[in-house]
From Swiss-Prot:
Modification Phosphoserine occurs at: 318-319, 324
ATP-binding is among the record's keywords: no
Keyword Nucleotide-binding: no
Annotated stretches, region: Disordered: 295-324, 368-402
Residue segments, region Important for interaction with ATG101: 127-134
Source organism of this protein record: Pan troglodytes
Ranges in coiled-coil conformation: none
Listed name of the protein: Autophagy-related protein 13
Gene that produces this protein: ATG13
InterPro entries found in the cross-reference section: ATG13, Atg13_N, HORMA_dom_sf
Subunit structure: Part of a complex consisting of ATG13, ULK1 and RB1CC1. Interacts with ATG101. Interacts with ULK1 (via C-terminus). Interacts with ULK2 (via C-terminus). Interacts (via the LIR motif) with GABARAP, GABARAPL, GABARAPL2. Interacts (via the LIR motif) with MAP1LC3A, MAP1LC3B and MAP1LC3C. Interacts with TAB2 and TAB3. Interacts with C9orf72.
Alphabetic keyword roster: Acetylation, Autophagy, Cytoplasm, Phosphoprotein
GO BP annotations, alphabetical order: autophagosome assembly; mitophagy; piecemeal microautophagy of the nucleus; protein localization to phagophore assembly site
Gene Ontology cellular component terms for the protein in this record: Atg1/ULK1 kinase complex; autophagosome; cytosol; phagophore assembly site
Length: 474
């Protein structure tokens, strides 16, 4: 389309649309991970905080989105779609919603690219953050587990709404006008979710040992199978080497589940085979091979490095405490298994792994239990004067008893209470406080008639004083 944009504005607009598409995929997929996402705001944003939003990217989602884009951008007649589907443990699948980012031919040539388009795209992304959490798929994603998982797929082309069933609804997130067209972000979602209940109760147990899902078709026969991936938090440095688009022969389909964060990823497969560089890295194999990734072409040493400090957690700690530094290295780690995986859980010890920067580590590991800065020595117990006065009667009678068995009795004396009403509980005190007694000064009943009689009798009682006062005035 012929436009009056200069080269710099055209370059900026393409960059804005590209990163908006990537952030759109991140927001949609992260909203289906099944956990709430809390991100702190920063007073000094970095260059990676596009559209004034601190959205931490998950590397695997970014890789799949870039592979789907393949160097092209959403334009007129070229829509980017994110399909969210559900798959049960029995092999049944159901499409839940389809998010579509498209552009039409309606242009706004007077709009400024540098600030106006950028700020409106930021508002559209904020609207997407809110709307992704009000559709029915969000409620299902919060409850996913071993019974079903949520999958996503990114593709370019015509929107495929036939899988949503009858009576699906659509919602428009918003539109942003640009000099080359109007960007539109919309969603079509399923409202008939009776699939889970009907199939769950209609299926009868087999009489013989028949595999129930043997003849169940794949959800997408023309594409590669969807492999459930272990949950990874946003911004986590997984250390996975993602292959390029040319190296991967799979269509842009992947999946994820909301298993708890993996406690340790076992390096290699069952036999410890390192990951080949030309294999696509995602799914359960990526979880098993996340640590040991090496390239035979370069001569670097292949060391097993953990993906993040938050992903590793000690599973077996003896009840007797840590005995020696050798026991720390012998600590057993267990791999977290994803849904539908029947492989045995292998155990690996850190003694078989190479420790990075081992030459800089001290030879004798000093445990935290023996560190005086972490665990200071216990100070001698000093008996306070108040405690001594409270226990003076009991300690004098039986000094041989255990001091920890004594109980300190403190009298409850609420404010503004009288000693004669004790003992009393808190409820009684509250009722007494709500209905206080009347002041004694208000209880004296002085009538108006008696006051008038007293005033009339004053001159008669003090006649001499009044006469003396009148004489002084003359």
């Amino acid at each position: 389309m012929e436009t009056d944009l200069n080269s710099q504005d055209r370059k900026d607009l393409d960059k804005f649309i590209k990163f908006f598409a990537l952030k759109t995929v991140q927001v949609i997929v992260q909203a289906r991970l099944g956990e709430k996402i809390c991100t702190r705001s920063s007073s000094s944003p970095t260059g990676s905080d596009w559209f004034n939003l601190a959205i931490k990217d998950i590397p695997e989602i970014t890789h799949e989105a870039k592979k789907a884009l393949a160097g092209q951008l959403p334009a007129v007649g070229r829509s980017m779609c994110v399909e969210i589907s559900l798959k049960t443990s029995e092999g049944d699948s159901m499409e839940l919603e389809i998010w579509c980012l498209e552009m039409n031919e309606k242009c706004d040539k007077e709009i400024k690219v540098s600030y106006t388009v950028y700020n409106r795209l930021s508002l559209l992304l904020k609207s997407l953050l809110a709307i992704t959490r009000v559709t029915p798929a969000y409620r299902l994603s919060r409850k996913q587990g071993h019974e079903y998982v949520i999958l996503y797929r990114i593709y370019f082309g015509e929107v495929q709404l036939s899988g949503l069933g009858e009576g699906f609804q659509t919602v428009r997130v918003g539109t942003v006008g640009t000099p080359v067209g109007t960007i539109t972000l919309s969603c079509a979602y399923r409202i008939n979710l009776a699939f889970m209940s009907t199939r769950q109760f209609e299926r009868t147990p087999p009489i013989m040992g028949i595999i129930i899902d043997h003849f169940v078709d794949r959800p997408y026969p023309s594409s590669s199978p969807m492999h459930p991936c272990n949950y990874r938090t946003a911004g986590e440095d997984t250390g996975v080497i993602y292959p390029s688009v040319e190296d991967s022969q799979e269509v842009c389909t992947t999946s994820f589940s909301t298993s708890p964060p993996s406690q340790l990823m076992v390096p290699g497969k069952e036999g410890g085979v390192p990951l080949a560089p030309n294999q696509p890295v995602h799914g359960t194999h990526a979880d098993q091979e996340r640590l040991a990734t090496c390239t035979p072409s370069d001569g670097t040493h292949c060391a097993a490095t953990p993906s993040s400090s938050e992903d590793t957690e000690t599973v077996s700690n003896s009840s007797e405490g840590r005995a020696s530094p050798h026991d720390v290295l012998e600590t057993i780690f267990v791999r977290k298994v994803g849904a539908f995986v029947n492989k045995p859980i292998n155990q690996v010890t850190l003694t078989s792994l190479d420790i990075p920067f081992a030459m800089f580590a001290p030879k004798n590991l000093e445990l935290e239990d023996t560190d005086p800065m972490v665990n200071p020595p216990d100070s001698p117990e000093t008996e306070s004067p108040l405690q001594g006065s409270l226990h003076s009667d009991g300690s004098s009678g039986g000094s041989s008893g255990n001091t920890h068995d004594d109980f300190v009795m403190i009298d409850f004396k609420p404010a503004f209470s009288k000693d004669d009403i004790l003992p009393m509980d808190l409820g009684t005190f509250y009722r007494e406080f709500q209905n206080p007694p009347q002041l004694s000064s208000l209880s004296i009943d002085i009538g108006a008639q008696s006051m008038a009689e007293d005033l009339d009798s004053l001159p008669e009682k003090n006649v001499r004083e009044f006469d003396a006062f009148v004489e002084t005035l003359q």
